[in-house]
Amino acid sequence: MRVLASCVDNGSLKEAVFGFGTDTSVQTAPQPQLIETHLCEGLDAHVEQIHKIDDGKWLLARHNGTVQYVESELVDHSEIEGMKVSHFDVVGSITGLLDVSRLDHLNAQSKRRTKLKDGFVSLAPVSKKDCYLACTKSGLVHILALNFKDKLLTKLQTFEVKAPLEFAQVYDVEKTKKTVFACGGEENLVKLFELSESCDKISMIWESKNVKNDRLDMRVPVWPVALKFLQPVPTSSAGYDKNKLNFQFLVVTGWSHFGIYNTQHGKRPMKYLDLLPEREPLRQLELLDPSHNTKAITQLGNLKCKETESLEFITTDKKTQVLKYNGQGQLIGKYGKGDITGLATYIGIHDQKYLLEGGLDRYLRVFDIESRAQKAKIYLGTNINRILVLDEELEALQEIEMAKNNKRKQTASDEEDDAEELWSKLETKKEKKRKL
């Protein structure tokens, strides 16, 4: 498996090549074939968002407010025979896309223990060809255009929405002429925005309402942190209203809630469940298709499924837990239980088979989705906040590993033969001495 990870401490991308069974925490276990560092720009410019446009074409959004267009290719490694390594070139960039001053007035109201910092919460394609949405925590929505011929990245428009934002999830379950995306954050209710086909206008088309007060008649705090879309309700279903918007989506919150929304049903969630006992904050949301249909998951992680009861999802808390639930909010199991020792800052799903995890304990891990067994564990020496699989390459790596193992076995066998030959010579000498 060839993997690319965004590393916070030095602002680099690290490329790792390894086979299943790799574990750098065990000396006798197989080790990575390659760990290579690329595009190192320092802590203040670490990569926050990565979007793969096509093979060898990338957009990177960095913590210093820069978005880069990067091209890559596989070349022969200069030192390891038979090994390929990626070569990255920054061919276009645009700077100055953050504005932390828009967050200053929110710091006094925030429940966070640290000061709010601006950064990118989303980087995704929109309906207009070769245009991309880059959203920031401070509520800036940038529309970027990429000219592949001239390798030029430009900013077309900037819109402002209410801050702070934890996410900006683009709807890609169906093809639409206009781009719809959802956003929200701390004390910022989920809103749906529509971007015009020409990307020159933006309008809010729907806003959620908070749930009713709890059993003590206390207001339930608002803090959506992640959202994923589902397929809309069929137009043939009972109660369908053509005059209402038709979107379904799932939300997890910073107060441990899991919400299921249907805009046909109303502005409040259809279900709003507590997942953790003491309202511990949740951070991320990744959807699974129970039928393991890879085509059911879109490029942006949304799910082409109408039924919420049959789906499964994975989320993380702000400690060390990576948790798998079903659509009813029932815990199925945990990944890396007892092994993950730091906050999981990133989880991602590859091909509906593997869960990629990285975090503050500086390890990149790969788990089997179904069995939750750990398939690989690689120490990268830095905090990790994004992971992408470039290609699996399992067969080649297994052949390399088998060749190494055969070589070790052959060496061990040769050593045993040499030892036996030496002992037989010594025994022969002893017998000759006795005869004399």
UniProtKB/Swiss-Prot annotation:
GO terms for cellular component: nucleolus; preribosome, large subunit precursor. Keywords: Nucleus, Ribosome biogenesis, rRNA processing. The keyword Aminoacyl-tRNA synthetase does not apply. One of its GO terms (biological process) is ribosomal large subunit biogenesis. It is found in: Nucleus, Nucleolus. Residues 405-436 are annotated as: Disordered. Its main location: nucleus. The keyword Ribosomal protein does not apply. Involved in the biogenesis of the 60S ribosomal subunit. Component of the pre-66S ribosomal particle. Belongs to the NSA1 family. This is Ribosome biogenesis protein NSA1. The gene is NSA1.
